Every structure is written in structure tokens, then in C-alpha cells.
Amino acid sequence: MHFIAISINHRTADVALREQVAFRDDALRIAHEDLYETKSILENVILSTCNRTEVYAVVDQIHTGRYYIQRFLARAFGFEVDDIKAMSEVKVGDEAVEHLLRVTSGLDSIVLGETQILGQIRDAFFLAQSTGTTGTIFNHLFKQAITFAKRAHNETDIADNAVSVSYAAVELAKKVFGKLKSKQAIIIGAGEMSELSLLNLLGSGITDITVVNRTIENAMKLAAKHQVKYDELSSLPNLLESADIVISSTSAQSYIITNEMIERIAENRKQDSLVLIDIAVPRDIEPGISAITNIFNYDVDDLKGLVDANLRERQLAAATISEQIPAEIHAHNEWVSMLGVVPVIRALREKAMAIQAETMDSIDRKLPGLSERERKIISKHTKSIINQMLKDPIKQAKELSSDKKSNEKFELFQNIFDIEAKCPHEQAKQQKESKVKEISARRIFSFE
């Protein structure tokens, strides 16, 4: 069995291509089933987000597994197989495990260290698990990856430092006010940066937000999309009297908020703090306003300094996380190597205990007068003899797991002890056959 990951992401394809190879949420369950029924696939998880579409699979052979996954993606999105090859990267074995760990912990994201991908990986795994397309390998590996990412985030605080301008704007407001939930905010502008700022404000717990814009229709549209208030730009002076936070991002060629405007409303604010954050170029807010008591005025250079410093912190945290990945890969490989041992040891124990049971039956027939206490003593000692006899063979079997020729030696081991144990590959194939029947039956039932 082999682990393979095929990824279409921000490094391998531009956004125009990525848009064409994203699964709709309501199509993912069927996609999991379709891929699972494909030749060579023993387990699979499909991850589809705005920045990446990835297939993780356990396959019986690397070259056939890779081909059938690429063919599956080509058919799903109306491309040729060669197109999928050109826009994707393929990772196999340890590289595939490393890729999953890096993706889950946010090291492979456009925004280094972001945590949203962890939830997306978890959702993808849970969907695959509930659909029936995961098995022994992925049920262990994905839980390991999720646990690793959680621990990495907690130990390094990699996601605590803002690395986008819009997010940094909200972080600056938090430095002044602490918690923002009860604060009033104004968003000036209705473009992409304004919307990102609005989303970050909502994410911080603020619900009292007003969007103002020179074109009222655009303000109304953005406000309706996120269920907040809107107003005309001419209402800004009145709104400023009660606002706590203002984030401005327009393409205006003159100042929208001036010193004079702030001086007029300052008298009515009763010394309440006001945070003005200007992320426009050219600037929307007149410089020098911060000289007024309790008025905090930040521009894009202030934000850039914070973003740059935070990015350096994230890069250091990412390096720390990266150093931990080899140990995780080793732990996974150790676990996988033991998979072949477990059935052999189980078969050996079962045979030994069957012999012990037969021996006890023989003793019962030949010595019918034994008391219950005597019988328990004999049973205990015969089991002890068996455990002592099995101790060295079991130790040897475990040591064989790391041998490059373990399959051949396990076969010899089974022949010596006259036992039969199914290898993980055979178990996975049987498991797949059973699950494919369940999927087919489920589809028939749904159709009816």
C-alpha cells in the first residue's frame, strides 16, 4: 500500500484555473464515492477550498493510483488528464505525509499559519469517514495531522499575529480597546479591502457596524450582504460622534476625514477614545489628527510595520513547526510498520490459546475429579507457559517490521508456526469490497 497526495494549489495554478477545479459542497460526498469505486484506490479524502483542491489516497500501486486520480479529476471538471498533470503536484510516501502535515498546520497556505485550513481538513476527513472512504491508515493519519496542527498552533501562537492589512487594522483597535464586542464601527468605502475589514470586525464580535460610501447603492449592497447598517457619506460627521472605530479605504483624491471635522465632534465625545485607521492610498484621513486627545490615527505605513513584524514572528514559528515534522513522519512510519505485525501476532496467540484450550479439555477428560481450584491453577500455569514460549517469537516479529524484506520474512515466520494472517493490503482490499457494496446499496435506496 502507498500514500499519495495530488494537489492543485496557489503554487501550481492561478486563480482562474483553481476556480474551475473546485468541488461544490453538495457534490463532495458523491465525489468521494466515485473516486473510492475507482480501480487502485483503497482509501481517499478530498479537500476542496478556495485556494486548493487535493486528493489524498491510499493506493495499491503508485503509478496506477496516480493515473486514476488524475483521470477522476479530469472527468470531474472537464479537462484532459495532461491538463490536470500540468496544474498539479504529486507527493508520494513520506513527502505526502509531510505535505498533509504542512497543509493542516497552515505552513502551505497563502497566509502563513492561518488556522481556517485546519477546520477545512477536519471537515474533509469527517465527510470522507462518514461516507465510508477512509480505513485504518487514514483514520489514524488524519487524526495525527489534526492533533499535530492543534499542538503546533498552541505551542507557537503562529496565528496570533496579523499578516493582512485588514486584519492588522482590527488588531490595532484591540490594542486600544481590548475587547471590541460592545464597540461601534464605521467602514468608509465599499470595495474589497472594506469588505475584508468588515469581515474582520464581525469576526472580533462587533455587531454595530455602519457602511458609508459616496455611492449609496454600493454601501447598501455591502451592508445587506453582511446584515449591517449603511448610510450616506454626508452623514459621516454625525456618525463620528458616537463611533469607536473607523476604517477607511476609498479611492478619493482628497481627505474624507479632516482635522476640522474631528475637532468639531471631539467636544461632544466626552474624551471617549476614537481609533481612525486609514488603509487607503492616497490617504483618506488627514495626518496630524492624532495630536487631538484620545484620537488614535493609523495609516497604511503603521499597519505595514505591524504586518512585517508579525510576518517575521510567523516565519520563526513556522520554522519551529517545520522542525517537528520529521518526528511526526517517523512516528507514522513506525505505526504503519506495526500494521503487518499485529495480524501475525494475533494469529500466533490465537493458535497458542487454542492449543491451551484443547489441553485443558484433555485434562478435564482424563482427570474428572479435579476441583475448580485445581483446574484454575492448572489453567493459569499452562497459559503462563504459553506466554513465556511466545515472548521471544513475538519480540522477533516486532523487530521484523522495520526490515526491508519484512514481507518475505513474515511469510517464513507464518510457515514455521503454521499460521495464516492477512496482510494489511489484503484487509484493505476486503474492506473496500464491503464498503463499495454498501455505497451501491445506498445509491439504489436513494434512487428509489
Swiss-Prot record:
| Active site, per annotation | 50 (nucleophile)
Q: Where does substrate bind?
A: 49-52, 109, 114-116, 120
User: GO MF terms on file?
Assistant: glutamyl-tRNA reductase activity; NADP binding
What EC number(s) does this enzyme carry? Answer: 1.2.1.70
Under the heading CDD domains, the entry gives: NAD_bind_Glutamyl_tRNA_reduct
Q: What class of enzyme is it?
A: oxidoreductase
Q: Name one Pfam family in it.
A: GlutR_dimer
Question: Its annotated pathway?
Answer: Porphyrin-containing compound metabolism; protoporphyrin-IX biosynthesis; 5-aminolevulinate from L-glutamyl-tRNA(Glu): step 1/2
> What is the top-level taxon of the source organism?
Bacteria
Alphabetic keyword roster: NADP, Oxidoreductase, Porphyrin biosynthesis
Instruction: Report what the protein is called.
Output: Glutamyl-tRNA reductase
Q: Which organism is it from?
A: Staphylococcus aureus (strain MRSA252)
Lineage of producing organism: Bacteria, Bacillati, Bacillota, Bacilli, Bacillales
